C-alpha cells in the first residue's frame, strides 16, 4: 500500500468512525425509555395505548376516568386503586355496558377514558373500547398491560368489602395484616389476623412483620382503622418483594361488622 493510498484509507476510516460516533451521540441524547413508559405497541388498533406512567398521572391529576373492564366479581377481588367498574351481568348485551359507561360520564362522550383488564392477552378492554368508539365516544385509550403490570410496578391495589369477605370466609388463602395500634388490636381484632401497626412501619419499616418467606406471591390483605392507615401498609409492602398485596379502603368497624354477619 502506497503512502497516498494508506493516507486515503486512514482518512476514510476516521470519517467512518466519526459518523458512527455522531450517530451514537445522537442516539444517547434521546432519553432512554423505561418500563414505566412501555406499552405493547400492537399495530392496527382502534384505540391508543397508555403506559404505567400515564396511568399514574391520570390517577394523580384526575384527567381521565380509569375504568376496570373486568367482571364485577374480579373487580371486587382486587383492582387498581382509584379505578371504577360499571360492568353489567355477564349475560347482558354489549349495548348495556355502553349505556352504563355513558351514564358514568353523564352523557359526555368526549370525556377521557382509560380502560384496563387482566393484561396483554385480556380482550375485555379491547372489546369495550371498540364498542365505545362505535357508539361515538371520542377519547378512549387502553392500559393494555393491565393489572399484572400495575402490580409488578408496585402500584397500589384495593380490594372491596365483598372481596375481603370472600377471601376471609370462603377462600381462606390470604394473610391478613391489621394496621391499627397494638392497644387497639388487643382490645378488638379479627380472628387469624396479624398486627402490623402502620405508625411503626413508617418509622421502622417491615422489620418483624410476618410476611411469607417461601412464597412471595402469597395473597396479603391489609386493613386498618381506615383506608388511609391501610394505604400506609400498602405503600410499605409495595417496596418489598411481595407481589400480591391488596388493601381494604374502608374502616375496621365496617369490616368487623361484615365479618360477624352470617
Where on the chain are the PLM-derived regions?
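Secreted/periplasmic proteins that engage bacterial cell-wall peptidoglycan
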Residues: 70
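Bacterial N-terminal signal peptides
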Residues: 16-27
Amino acid at each position: 500500500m502506497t503512502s497516498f493510498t494508506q493516507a486515503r484509507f486512514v482518512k476514510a476510516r476516521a470519517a467512518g468512525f466519526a459518523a458512527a460516533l455522531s450517530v451514537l451521540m445522537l442516539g444517547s441524547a434521546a432519553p432512554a425509555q423505561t418500563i414505566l413508559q412501555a406499552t405493547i405497541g400492537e399495530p392496527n388498533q382502534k384505540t391508543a395505548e397508555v403506559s404505567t406512567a400515564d396511568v399514574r398521572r391520570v390517577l394523580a391529576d384526575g384527567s381521565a376516568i380509569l375504568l376496570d373492564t373486568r367482571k364485577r366479581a374480579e373487580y371486587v377481588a382486587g383492582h387498581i386503586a382509584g379505578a371504577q367498574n360499571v360492568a353489567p351481568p355477564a349475560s347482558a348485551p354489549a349495548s348495556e355496558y355502553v349505556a352504563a359507561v355513558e351514564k358514568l360520564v353523564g352523557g359526555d362522550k368526549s370525556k377521557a377514558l382509560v380502560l384496563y383488564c387482566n393484561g396483554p392477552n385480556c380482550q375485555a378492554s379491547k372489546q369495550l373500547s371498540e364498542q365505545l368508539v362505535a357508539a361515538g365516544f371520542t377519547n378512549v385509550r387502553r392500559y393494555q398491560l393491565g393489572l399484572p403490570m400495575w402490580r409488578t410496578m408496585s402500584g397500589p391495589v384495593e380490594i372491596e368489602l365483598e372481596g375481603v369477605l370472600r377471601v376471609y370466609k370462603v377462600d381462606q388463602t390470604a394473610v391478613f395484616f391489621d394496621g391499627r395500634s397494638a392497644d387497639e388490636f388487643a382490645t378488638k381484632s379479627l380472628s387469624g389476623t396479624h398486627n402490623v401497626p402502620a405508625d411503626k412501619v413508617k418509622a421502622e419499616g417491615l422489620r418483624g412483620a410476618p410476611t411469607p418467606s417461601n412464597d412471595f406471591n402469597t395473597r396479603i390483605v391489609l386493613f386498618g382503622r381506615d383506608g388511609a392507615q391501610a394505604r400506609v401498609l400498602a405503600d410499605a409492602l409495595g417496596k418489598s418483594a411481595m407481589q400480591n398485596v391488596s388493601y381494604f379502603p374502608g374502616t375496621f368497624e365496617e369490616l368487623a361488622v361484615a365479618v360477624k354477619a352470617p
